[in-house]
Regions:
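Alpha-helical metal-binding/catalytic segments enriched in His/Glu/Asp
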Residues: 42-43
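Extended beta-strand/beta-hairpin segments
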Residues: 1-37, 48-154
């Protein structure tokens, strides 16, 4: 994977990848907000793709993410909480398994920060809070076997 960033004007930059390009408009949206959005988009896409591969449907998916950062430089993430809210035609156990599979195995961006950042999550499925402030069960970079689940290509 390769990304090239080129300065356009003032605090605007163009990011080019092999698949396309987009404009980064700082300080309207800061680079750390783009980074956070990328983290959330990675796991959110898994919560669509994993169920789809199991002939299940997810609707009304919203994922909120919040970080606490160092006050001093470098202002890295200390903790990261994800709040998943979605409906599906699966039971609560399967819905929780999709989130865990994304966080523990498939989402490359979350797994990139998990050794240095405390990551927690909550899940509201079909209107019911089924997990609250759960911690990731791994953190040392080890894989967890969830069987055959195909996720969004990174």
């Amino acid at each position: 994977m390769k990304v090239t960033i080129s300065h356009q004007e003032d605090m605007k930059f163009e990011a080019k990848t092999a698949k396309g390009s987009f404009i980064i408009d700082c300080p309207v949206i800061s680079p750390i907000e783009y980074f956070l959005a990328g983290l959330i988009a990675c796991t959110t896409s898994d919560i669509i793709v994993i169920p789809k591969n199991q002939n299940r449907t997810v609707t009304d998916l919203v994922v909120d993410g919040e970080v606490i950062r160092n006050e001093d430089h470098p202002r890295k993430f200390n903790s990261f909480h994800l709040d998943y809210n979605f409906n599906s035609d699966a039971d609560d156990m399967m819905a929780a398994r999709w989130v865990m599979a994304s966080l523990e195995t498939y989402c490359s961006t979350v797994n990139t920060i998990r050794d240095t950042t405390a990551i927690t999550y909550s899940i509201t499925h079909n209107g019911t809070l089924i997990k609250e402030n759960e911690s990731m069960i791994s953190g040392g970079g080890s894989n967890i076997d969830f069987g055959e689940i195909e996720s969004c290509p990174s």
